[in-house]
């Protein structure tokens, strides 16, 4: 078996940037940044309010209707 080829595992604290919940894990990385976690994600919390994202075609149709009026 070769020595010193394995990654060094260290304790790491991950903090969600949305709800500021922190998780303690063991990882070979120095830092991990997450935007959303299971504590604040709508799928896990049961929040079913979905914001409809307006697409490029919808934006174009609105501009076209304004110009025609």
Curated annotation (Swiss-Prot):
Which family is this protein grouped under?
Belongs to the bacterial ribosomal protein bL31 family. Type A subfamily.
Any idea what this protein is called? Large ribosomal subunit protein bL31
Spell out the subunit comment.
Part of the 50S ribosomal subunit.
Xref: Pfam families? Ribosomal_L31
HAMAP family referenced in this protein's UniProt entry, alphabetically = Ribosomal_bL31_1
Q: Which organism is it from?
A: Mycoplasmopsis pulmonis (strain UAB CTIP) (Mycoplasma pulmonis)
- Give the encoding gene's name: rpmE
Domain of life the protein comes from: Bacteria
Q: Which GO terms describe its cellular component?
A: ribonucleoprotein complex; ribosome
Identify the InterPro entries for this entry.
Ribosomal_bL28/bL31-like_sf, Ribosomal_bL31, Ribosomal_bL31_A, Ribosomal_bL31_sf
What are the disulphide bonds in this sequence?
none
Q: Which UniProt keywords apply?
A: Ribonucleoprotein, Ribosomal protein, RNA-binding, rRNA-binding
Q: What function does this protein fulfil? A: Binds the 23S rRNA.
What the entry lists under PROSITE patterns is as follows: RIBOSOMAL_L31
What would be an example GO MF term here?
structural constituent of ribosome
Listed NCBIfam families? L31 (TIGR00105), PRK00019.1 (NF000612)
A GO BP annotation:
translation
UniProt entry tagged with the keyword Ribosomal protein: yes
Taxonomic lineage per UniProt?
Bacteria, Bacillati, Mycoplasmatota, Mycoplasmoidales, Metamycoplasmataceae
């Amino acid at each position: 078996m070769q020595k010193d080829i394995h990654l060094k595992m260290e304790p790491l604290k991950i903090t969600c940037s949305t709800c500021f919940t922190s998780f303690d894990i063991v990882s070979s990385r120095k830092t991990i940044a997450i935007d959303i976690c299971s504590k604040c994600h709508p799928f896990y919390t049961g929040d079913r309010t979905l914001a409809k994202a307006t697409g490029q075609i919808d934006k174009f149709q609105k501009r076209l209707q304004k110009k025609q009026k």
